[in-house]
């Protein structure tokens, strides 16, 4: 009896999830792009002000000058 109850509850959850996701496909796609835009960080170009929390574009933040700059290799 317990196995039958578990199978019944599992089937109910699957059909409920399938039914509710059909009408919300458009909204799910919108949420996905919103999430991606929040996850995308903007970077600071060379010469702009920066600090320890700033993400410089393919550069590094020179904390002495507080500006993003290209690394120089000896």
Curated annotation (Swiss-Prot):
The presence of a 'disulfide through disulfide knot' structurally defines this protein as a knottin. Belongs to the conotoxin O1 superfamily. Residues 1-17 form the signal peptide. Disulfide bonds join 43-57, 50-61, 56-68. This is Conotoxin AbVII. One of its GO terms (cellular component) is extracellular region. It comes from Conus abbreviatus (Abbreviated cone). The keyword Disulfide bond applies. Coiled coil: none annotated. One of its GO terms (molecular function) is toxin activity. InterPro entries: Conotoxin (IPR004214). Residues 19-41 are annotated as: Disordered. Residues 18-40 form a propeptide. Pfam families: Conotoxin.
